[in-house]
Amino acid sequence: MLGPATFLPLTAALLLLIPGGRAQFPRQCVTPEALRSGQCCPGLFPALTPDPADRCGASVGRGRCAPLQVDARPHGPQYPHDGVDDREQWPTRFFNNSCLCAENFSGYDCGSCKPGWVGVNCNQRVLAVRRNILDLTAQERRRFIAALDLAKRTTHPHYVIASRRYAEIMGPDGNSTQFENVSIYNFFVWTHYYSIGKTFLGAGRESFGGIDFSHEGPAFVTWHRYHLLQLERDMQEMLQDPTFALPYWNFAIGGNECDICTDDFMGARSNFDSILLSSNSVFSQWRVLCESLEGYDTLGTICNSTEGGPIRRNPGGNVARPMVQRLPEPQDVALCLEVGLFDTPPFYSNSSESFRNTVEGYSEPSGKYDPSVRSLHNLAHLFLNGTGGQTHVSPNDPIFVLLHTFTDAVFDEWLRRHNADISLYPLENAPIGHNRQYNMVPFWPPVSNNEMFVTAPESLGYSYEVQWPSRALNFTEIITIAVVAALVLVAVIFAAASCAVHRSRKDDVHQPLLGEQYPRYSEEYERDASQSAV
């Protein structure tokens, strides 16, 4: 989380935290010359090298310009239009060379450090700790909300977004590239939108919607993990605080109340319109990016930096779907964590006994696929019933950040509990974009799914503080325990009865041979102690 108020100013060395990968592209790479060359290998002159011809920090041993590696293995049958979409074999439609960084160096120009490392030589460890937003102090909470709002209003210092497909990227005159500035938070929104958009098949043809590079497949957890890491690192740089961490919302609390939908947290309901946010929350002033999905799909345009209407939210208010009027239960998380397989064929939203499909929310918490079920991540989104419940615009509601941070915490805990290794992730035949070695769309420089299939504290520079629920007993287990308890009780009663019978028999054996009317030896001795005891 944000460091305490007494946090010392960072040295210039610690400020080398330029994020390691982003989308769309760095400003240096969107000139007509760079796009025509297919190379995006900016240099570090004059910041870190005196060589004006430097590329990727090669002159100081930080990296080199190298051909891109892309996944060419077969994808699943869900997408039949190979060769049409700009996002296929990402990012080769735009570039075929990028910076390949050495050791702990990272970034589009190798000028920054890998997650978890800081310093001029990227040799100092740092760990950001993600905590429950309800556990933050009032000061920490206010600083986090203020930081989000600042990110919404601050132009991204490094990256720009495309406003046209590749076929139109050079502009009407063939020499005016179609990219726009965007704020840090809206950049986060735009990358999510770009990953889920339909495939444009041409004017007058219906766009193809059976494609999603960040949902309904194995990459759901890896893509969103990097998506969050991107925002966190952007905000660390903005705040000049390498310990800044995104908090999480534990949405698995059951019931029909949103415990963070208050003005102290993420915004209460407006007193004047129940689907808008209270004017006492800064988030009521936020405007939504990428709303006009229909226009994008039919005209082949791409969402640009233009904002639209306000955030809408009506938690638990979808009366037409009672099943999404309640949040997931704590036991849903416990059950999900016990699902042993990461993913199962067809590696899609109808996979059964798949941890990924379970945490995404297309299966029952136990892992069994049921087309009528929406659970965990999906249920939390649908419960919000507004901007946060619509996939293409959901990141506009800042609750998205907290919801997905908790989802990532579940993923990280599953990796730890199951000692998961990359062999569990499908190498091929997953939906397009979801194979193990596919470069996640639209991050730059390229980041593959397998790079995010690791435990976070050891590899990604952050950890979680979470108390995980224990799993409740199911009906069969309760019956089994009851039967065993009954058998134990019967055994105890039988043992007690046996002991009583045994004691009774033992007492019979030791009954005196003489009755009470006969004097005992001791009595005779006591009456005449002078007589012989023989």
Curated annotation (Swiss-Prot):
The chain crosses the membrane at residues 478-501. GO terms for molecular function: metal ion binding; monooxygenase activity. It is found in: Melanosome membrane. This is 5,6-dihydroxyindole-2-carboxylic acid oxidase. Contains bound zinc ions after heterologous expression in insect cells. GO terms for cellular component: melanosome; melanosome membrane. It is a single-pass type I membrane protein. Residues 1-23 form the signal peptide. The gene is TYRP1. InterPro entries: Di-copper_centre_dom_sf, LE_dom, Tyrosinase/Hemocyanin, Tyrosinase_Cu-bd.
